[in-house]
Amino acid sequence: MARMIQCAKLGKEAEALDFPPLPGELGKRIYESVSKEAWQGWLKQQTMLINENRLNMADPRARQYLMKQTEKYFFGDGADQASGFVPPTEG
């Protein structure tokens, strides 16, 4: 049976991650309170940030920026939006 958690991002009970997705305290915090569904949403957001901002992941400053954005996305006021991003409309 899948482990269920109260997802901090989605505000509902959902299936938990199978393992901490990042090292350290942030990874542990995400593992304990973020669902698989919310993590998939972050991966899409992260990809947009990397591409739109042309981040070089070999650069420690780019990695530090993404770690801050990860924390803001799940536990703060939301991560930065990629410039020019327009969310898809339903209908």
UniProtKB/Swiss-Prot annotation:
InterPro entries: Fe_traffick_prot_YggX, Fe_traffick_prot_YggX_sf. One of its GO terms (biological process) is cellular response to oxidative stress. It comes from the Bacteria. GO terms for molecular function: iron ion binding. Gene3D superfamilies: Fe(II) trafficking protein YggX. Keywords: Iron. One of its GO terms (cellular component) is cytosol. Could be a mediator in iron transactions between iron acquisition and iron-requiring processes, such as synthesis and/or repair of Fe-S clusters in biosynthetic enzymes. Belongs to the Fe(2+)-trafficking protein family. This is Probable Fe(2+)-trafficking protein. The lineage of its organism: Bacteria, Pseudomonadati, Pseudomonadota, Betaproteobacteria, Burkholderiales.
